[in-house]
Amino acid sequence: MSFDGMFTYGMTHELNEKIMGGRITKVHQPYKHDVIFHIRAKGKNQKLLLSAHPSYSRVHITAQAYENPSEPPMFCMLLRKHIEGGFIEKIEQAGLDRIMIFHIKSRNEIGDETVRKLYVEIMGRHSNIILTDAAENVIIDGLKHLSPSMNSYRTVLPGQDYKLPPAQDKISPLEASEDDILRHLSFQEGKLDKQIVDHFSGVSPLFAKEAVHRAGLANKVTLPKALLALFAEVKEHRFIPNITTVNGKEYFYLLELTHLKGEARSFESLSELLDRFYFGKAERDRVKQQAQDLERFVVNERKKNANKIKKLEKTLEYSENAKEFQLYGELLTANLYMLKKGDKQAEVINYYDEESPTITIPLNPNKTPSENAQAYFTKYQKAKNSVAVVEEQIRLAQEEIEYFDQLIQQLSSASPRDISEIREELVEGKYLRPKQQKGQKKQKPHNPVLETYESTSGLTILVGKNNRQNEYLTTRVAARDDIWLHTKDIPGSHVVIRSSEPDEQTIMEAATIAAYFSKAKDSSSVPVDYTKIRHVKKPNGAKPGFVTYDSQHTVFVTPDADTVIKLKKS
């Protein structure tokens, strides 16, 4: 658990520095568990994300763009009514718990000044956002309701008194002394990191393991010294926001994690750190839920076509025996005088072989020798004719597999909007039936929205995240001399640089984006082709997003999320 009480302490300090006194100009709720405040503070506009997501609960300033629903949810409307236009007086933490309290001064409908408290409880699947009347300590409403039958200790319903979750009887690390540490830790019992978590509030196993590691040979001298030093780093706001990667797994924290042997990357702020760490994670989780049926359908269709090819290849194998059937027919015709009806096989010399071996030809005893010869000629003709048909069916099935591979890749990096476009594409392709509900008007066709990036040198880079977007970008948006990029022989996004002569750095940055939004996202040294749009063609009758191209150059890049985040325009 990286977002522990100590991290909450650090984030509370950071937000007070950045947005205290700021005005909440807009409130949005893009997703079920996430609320965004647009805040004007310290002379600039900032976005604050409050998330009660069961897996990704957090609070931080964000630079990410969020798509809002056409109709705001009820909780969003309630927040707009009570705190939109209000000022954030201060932000505090409940003890060292993972609870942040926003004090917001606003005015009600008749112009009277009001003070609201917004509690953000960062507690995993029990996370919540609760608005209260500060004067009465009464709940106005919560993102999630908690009835007495669900929790006997506290109720989260409108009109009920707000009650903090039960406090744990632990020592505050920020006030702890060496005596406190020695009094509560038993060096004989072992598992010192667990003891630290059990006795000190706001401390996670990650923090405790770091303390034990810094103590070296942990004893009554070294461990208190290491703990007090870490407590002081937090108390004095000497943060080193970082993400450390060990064997592909990422850990974030506000202090350096020397006990983890991996690659560490530092950030300017805790908010920037969380923006990077959670980039795409929560959205991918939402997409996974929305696209479960689509993913299952696409994978099944791919599997069907793969099985179809296996069967067709067996048919082709049989068809390729056509020459043998022809040989049998000719040899039987040449030896009719030796055969009679009722024979089960014929022993004949193969005159077409230089060594003239004797071969055995199976016969149908119910047929005359001439009828047996004709049966083999019929088999030969049928097999010969079927080869072309079977080969064409294999080609079509292979095209289907490539198409579904492309969709699988697109689903892996899709946004909720992308999902609906992929669904529409499958409906238009007659793969799925339309989900038209009773009384629902058919939506007018709309142009896809493309993701926009800006290179270090200021050039615009556009990205298609699904076949509809790819086709729209490549065939309608891009100019003839714009630069088009795509991973070489790997399913991925179409990427366009809006320039005829981009600098080398822009080409490499656009190639990195193309590799990131491809099936080779987790690979290194990925080949990316680039050419001018004039050299990119869509064959007649090709599936959406399929193109051919020539006159290309190839660069090799390693996909990098940090580059993608840095270049994305919010």
UniProtKB/Swiss-Prot annotation:
Sorted UniProt keywords: Cell adhesion, Protein biosynthesis, RNA-binding, rRNA-binding, tRNA-binding
The induction text for this entry reads: Expressed during exponential growth, decreases in stationary phase. Transcription is down-regulated by AbrB and DegU in logarithmic and stationary phase respectively.
- Report the leader peptide range: none
UniProt xrefs under InterPro entries: NFACT_RNA-bd, RQC_Subunit_NEMF, RqcH_bacterial
Q: What does the record note as the disruption phenotype of the gene behind this chain?
A: Bacteria no longer adhere to fibronectin or collagen, decreased biofilm formation. Bacteria no longer inhibit binding of other bacteria to fibronectin.
Q: Which organism is it from?
A: Bacillus subtilis subsp. natto (strain BEST195)
Molecular function terms, GO-annotated: ribosomal large subunit binding; rRNA binding; tRNA binding
Tell me any Pfam family this protein matches. Answer: NFACT-R_1
For this record, an example GO cellular component is: RQC complex
Q: Which family does it belong to?
A: Belongs to the NEMF family.
UniProt GO BP: cell adhesion; rescue of stalled ribosome
Q: What does this gene product do?
A: Key component of the ribosome quality control system (RQC), a ribosome-associated complex that mediates the extraction of incompletely synthesized nascent chains from stalled ribosomes and their subsequent degradation. RqcH recruits Ala-charged tRNA, and with RqcP directs the elongation of stalled nascent chains on 50S ribosomal subunits, leading to non-templated C-terminal alanine extensions (Ala tail). The Ala tail promotes nascent chain degradation. May add between 1 and at least 8 Ala residues. Binds to stalled 50S ribosomal subunits.
**Sequence intervals crossing the membrane:** none
How does this protein assemble?
Associates with stalled 50S ribosomal subunits, binds to RqcP.
Q: What is this protein called?
A: Rqc2 homolog RqcH
